[in-house]
């Protein structure tokens, strides 16, 4: 089957990119590809059998027209000016059979006009982390970009140490970022901001294109998508680590996996990025930061969208987030209905978990085994203050009995939303260290495991992290 690529971005947004081709690596070789995703995209298996090829930027497929996008942004709350694709190149937009499209974005593809002081490269460590994280999030049901392939090489890349150069093929319906809009707003070119909005609506919100109120309705949906995404992050204990405006997707996708981390111990102020000295992007601050980012986007739209309409949409953010968050947390607790004591029970559990530094994922998974008429719980042994747990657990079982559903029905629901497996940093690190020595077994094994996060397991993927893995520090270095 011949893949079809189109050039909407190149043709319709001529001032938002520089056309250029990837710069191949030395002795590049394909070490992993996503068979399931490749099948979904109707990619012939033969493309993965002839060396690095397109996956290493050595060849282009018919119809591809590679380019690097320009955008700007706020980083750690401070205006950073022009940024752009400093190491990534959009190879093309694949047109799928259903009429939708998928960007093919090659990360680590070499120098671009937007590399600033960088070398345009990515390292094996960061490409493995992004591939694992994006696939883990996908199978958790959270909107995200996807990983299609990883290529490693003999090219040395200099970070804190010398690391192997690598490339990641990332795919997504769009790489539209909040920072694209900021770029032209701060250049005082509101007509180009509007052009971006029209492009987004035409291709991703086409049902609004003929509505006279399209900009307001579109921004309302961007707010809602962002609120929903952040709510989902919070329910699985995911910290992004670097929520700059240029790292946020207009479509509400999780984008740019750098110094991310999933909670081990329940620590509301968890900081996963060791460069985040002020805790701006701490786990518990993500909802507030996302609203701040939406406010920055609203500012760029203010020349052609009524400020009252923008503020009305922004005012809806908290309620949308709380609604999504509340629904999912009730499911995680096994509540089939909404009762007035639900929030108090959840907050009391969180207080107990924070005090005891309980493992976030394990606590909710073990809670899924609760039998409403039995005071016995395997979760009890996870707490030192047994009396405090017993008191909370008795009230929790009383709340379960209000819903009048069987244990099996409730447990099935809970186990479908409380994963047994999340991508803890130590699991990724173990796969990385093996891969850097030439052994890809753990990389493939972990990828396979992450496809079934809600299945019961009895291996170390679902055990408590070892001491060395609890406080792994991760930087933006990639």
Swiss-Prot record:
This protein's UniProt keywords: ATP-binding, Magnesium, Manganese, Metal-binding, Nucleotide-binding, Nucleotidyltransferase, Transferase
Cofactor(s) recorded in Swiss-Prot or TrEMBL: Mg(2+); Mn(2+)
EC number in record: 2.7.7.-, 2.7.7.108
Keyword Aminoacyl-tRNA synthetase belongs to the record: no
Catalytic site positions: 246
Pfam families from the UniProt entry: SelO (PF02696)
Amino-acid positions noted as binding ATP in the UniProt annotation, renumbered to this chain: 84, 86-87, 107, 119-120, 170, 177, 256
GO molecular function: AMPylase activity; ATP binding; magnesium ion binding
Binding site for Mg(2+): 247, 256
Known role: Nucleotidyltransferase involved in the post-translational modification of proteins. It can catalyze the addition of adenosine monophosphate (AMP) or uridine monophosphate (UMP) to a protein, resulting in modifications known as AMPylation and UMPylation.
Matching PANTHER family: PROTEIN ADENYLYLTRANSFERASE SELO, MITOCHONDRIAL (PTHR32057:SF14)
Family (UniProt): Belongs to the SELO family.
The protein, known as: Protein nucleotidyltransferase YdiU
Species of provenance: Escherichia coli O157:H7
């Amino acid at each position: 089957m011949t893949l079809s690529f189109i050039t909407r971005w190149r043709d319709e947004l001529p001032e938002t990119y520089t056309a250029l081709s990837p710069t191949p690596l030395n002795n590049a070789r394909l070490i992993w590809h996503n068979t399931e995703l490749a099948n979904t995209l109707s990619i012939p298996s033969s493309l993965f059998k002839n060396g690095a090829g397109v996956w290493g930027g050595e060849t282009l497929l018919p119809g591809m027209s590679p380019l690097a996008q320009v955008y700007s942004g706020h980083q750690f709350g401070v205006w950073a000016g022009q940024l752009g694709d400093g190491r990534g190149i959009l190879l093309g937009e694949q047109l799928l059979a259903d009429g939708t499209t998928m960007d093919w974005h090659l990360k680590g593809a070499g120098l671009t006009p937007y590399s600033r002081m960088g070398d345009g490269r990515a390292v094996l460590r960061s490409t493995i982390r992004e591939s694992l994280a994006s696939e883990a999030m996908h199978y958790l049901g959270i909107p995200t970009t996807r990983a299609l392939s990883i290529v490693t090489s003999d090219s040395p890349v200099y970070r804190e140490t010398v690391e192997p150069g690598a490339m990641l093929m990332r795919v997504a319906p769009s790489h539209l970022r909040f920072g694209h809009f900021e770029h032209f707003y701060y250049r005082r070119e509101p007509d180009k901001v509007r052009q971006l909005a029209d492009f987004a609506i035409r291709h991703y919100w086409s049902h609004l294109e003929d509505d006279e109120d399209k900009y307001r309705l579109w921004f309302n949906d961007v707010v809602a998508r962002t609120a929903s995404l952040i709510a989902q992050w919070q329910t699985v204990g995911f910290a992004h680590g670097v929520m700059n405006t240029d790292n946020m997707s207009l479509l509400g996708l999780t984008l740019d996996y750098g110094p991310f981390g999933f909670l081990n111990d329940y620590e509301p102020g968890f900081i996963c990025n060791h460069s985040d000295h002020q805790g701006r992007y701490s786990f518990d601050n993500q909802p507030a930061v996302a609203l701040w980012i939406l406010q920055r986007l609203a500012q760029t739209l203010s020349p052609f969208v009524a400020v009252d309409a923008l503020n009305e949409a922004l005012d809806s953010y908290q309620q949308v987030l709380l609604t999504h968050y509340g629904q999912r947390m009730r499911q995680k607790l096994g509540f089939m209905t909404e009762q007035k004591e639900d929030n108090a029970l959840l907050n009391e559990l969180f207080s107990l978990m924070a005090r005891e530094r309980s493992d976030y994922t394990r606590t909710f998974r073990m809670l899924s085994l609760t039998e409403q008429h039995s005071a016995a719980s395997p979760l009890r042994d996870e707490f030192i203050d047994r009396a405090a747990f017993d008191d909370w657990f008795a009230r929790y079982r009383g709340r379960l009995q209000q819903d009048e559903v069987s244990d099996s029905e409730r447990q099935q629901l809970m186990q479908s939303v409380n994963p047994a497996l999340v991508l803890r940093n130590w699991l990724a690190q173990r796969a990385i260290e093996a891969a850097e020595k030439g052994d890809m077994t753990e990389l493939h094994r972990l990828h396979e495991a992450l496809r079934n996060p809600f299945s019961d397991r009895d291996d170390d993927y679902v055990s408590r992290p070892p001491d060395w893995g609890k406080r792994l520090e991760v930087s933006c270095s990639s």
